[in-house]
Amino acid sequence: MEENLYCLRKGTRLIGRYTVEGVLGQGGFGITYLGMDELHKKKVAIKEFFPQGIVTRNIEYEDTVTVTLVGEKENYDKGKERFLKEAQTMAMFSKDKGIVKALDFFEINNTAYIVMEYLEGVTLKQYLRENKRIAAEDLVELLVPLIEALDEIHSQGLIHRDISPDNIMVLPDGRIKLMDFGAARDYTEFGEKSLSIVLKPGYAPPEQYQTHGVQGPWTDIYALCATMYKCITGENPPDAIDRLVDDHLKKISAFGITVSPQIEEAIIKGMSVAAKDRYQNVGDFCEDLYGGYEERSVLGAEESQAEPVVAEANVETKMDVLTEETPQSKYPTTEAVQEREKLISKELSENAGLTSE
């Protein structure tokens, strides 16, 4: 991908450990780089908080990000805090096979970075653009790790709030992973404060259009079922707001597609306009979709090997960082990062010495 004037230059070293090797993707809120972890000698993806339109950087002279839009410094700092919160959320689920792993995060250059595992593959959106549809039976098997990961997310009182084909990675070996936790929130606090509005037409249920909409696991279940609907039919799911007036959601079988009544009914129920009519948790959804969540978990991704479904491709990550008020930062300070650079430099030198002997 072609780099712009604001991207870090190839060869830039971050905290003495990560070397920038190129640009993977750019979005309205940031830049994603291909990087090299010099300590472990492996490729990584590095997300940089860089909200376009309010910041700049002159890479001819420095790597530091500068806020240029008058009056936006406070919003920039809040957005950076949310960005680091995303890393913290991802790190909570680093052992889940269905979630992209966050390996590291830190502040430097007056901005913030998240280091993630580098995945070769395509987004589900890109895959569907090339292949149109996925057979229903194949899809429900592929989704097992992601659904189990979503259940774990909900068990921690969190909801993702942005599940859609462009936030799911499909890997060359057939595995899929959920990414982009920029919109994740603690749903257990919805009674005390409103959740900010985050929506993607077709995948967002009605409660996400409302400032004080009551969101919970049922919100993610709607988005997941809408994503499944898109995968199986090849058609974009209708906007939930339009369905409030005239619910014209076609059943999957109405497209002339072969699908078991069990799968179809579970997806359609999960896409119910009224939250009370949807599944209230992942376990109940899986009970209908698979005929027994616990049984399916035992047969999950650890024992079954999915057939390859895509060719290798580079990752292009979307940034979606909100600027809302958050608690005082608990992330690494500039002094801590500088101290860490010294330790990393020492370890790299020692490793180099061992290699040369």
Labelled PLM ranges:
Residues 104-105:
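Activation-segment/catalytic-loop signature of the eukaryotic protein kinase fold
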Residues 146-158:
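Protein kinase catalytic-loop region centered on the HRD/HxD motif
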